A protein has these predicted regions:
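Short, hinge-like loop/turn segments at secondary-structure boundaries
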Residues: 57-60, 80-82, 145-149, 187-191
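Aromatic- and acid-rich polysaccharide-binding/catalytic face
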Residues: 89-92, 98, 133-154, 166-169
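Active-site-adjacent substrate/metal-binding segments within catalytic domains
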Residues: 1-114, 118, 129-130
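Short hydrophobic/aromatic-enriched beta-strand-loop microsegments
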Residues: 58-66, 146-153, 169-175
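Short, well-ordered alpha-helical microsegments
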Residues: 7, 47-50, 137-138, 155-159
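Structural motif corresponding to alpha-helix initiation and N-cap regions
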Residues: 25, 75-79, 154-155, 209-213
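Substrate-binding clefts and catalytic carboxylate motifs of secreted carbohydrate-active enzymes
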Residues: 1, 92-94, 113-123, 130, ...
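Catalytic metal-binding/acid-base residues of hydrolase active sites
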Residues: 66-67, 99-101, 134-135, 153, ...
């Protein structure tokens, strides 16, 4: 199965974060119409009703932890949502964290990620572990995680990473222009609008065409 995924926050336009169950179904159905088959929950565990919709409608899921760490509270957070969610067949991976900039690229991050990964596997050994990384390569989390999650691929030399870790799979966990195009026909960085998504908004972001070359 080839992953065609999207990175999604829990809120919905015009509604906020308290979504009725019918809107969970609506969202998953619309994503499937677009050709999407995988849903990354960012940056926290989802409501169970979303996972029910993914199970029912056939959407793969990356279920994500809110905060990395090795204190008892961090373990309790992981345990709580994993025990709640692990019987959902839609879940294909557990994410232990997102963009932990202070520890991504150092030995402290590698140790924390290794410890969290081992703990996660003690609760569920059937799914791969990932973490979404944004810039902290080479010496940290990316060295020890099962599946490397890449946020903003313009920040990493993928050939160098693959050469160093040839057996480590990777997937894109977050990309975005952080701009809007609806009803817009000009570029205005201050207003965060752009004429079209096939343009490169800022240096470390890629246009759609630029980004495709990194994905199989």
């Amino acid at each position: 199965v080839k992953i065609h995924g999207t990175n999604n926050h829990q809120d919905h336009a015009g509604v906020g974060v308290a979504l009725p169950d019918a809107l969970q179904d609506y969202r998953i159905k619309k994503l499937k119409e677009f050709g999407v088959n995988a849903y990354r929950c960012s940056h926290n565990p989802p409501t169970p009703e979303l996972l029910d919709a993914c199970d029912r409608l056939g959407m793969l899921v990356i279920d994500e932890n809110r905060l990395m760490g090795v204190a008892s509270t961090h373990y309790e957070y992981m345990k709580r949502f994993m025990l709640r969610d692990r019987n959902h067949p839609s879940i294909i991976s557990w994410s232990i964290g997102n963009e932990e900039w202070g520890i991504e690229g150092n030995i402290k991050g590698a140790r924390i990620a290794s410890t969290m990964q081992a703990y996660t596997k003690s609760l569920d050994s059937t799914r791969a572990i990932t973490a979404a990384i944004s810039g902290g390569w080479r010496e940290g989390i990316s060295n020890v995680i099962d599946v490397m999650g890449v946020n903003y691929i313009g920040q990493i030399n993928t050939d160098e990473q693959h050469k160093k870790f040839p057996n480590q799979p990777a997937w894109g966990t977050e990309e975005g222009s952080t701009r809007a195009t609806r009803g817009i026909y000009f570029d205005d960085t201050k207003a965060q609008v752009m004429a079209a998504y096939d343009k490169k908004p800022i240096p470390n972001f890629y246009s759609i065409e630029d980004g495709w070359k990194y994905y199989a």
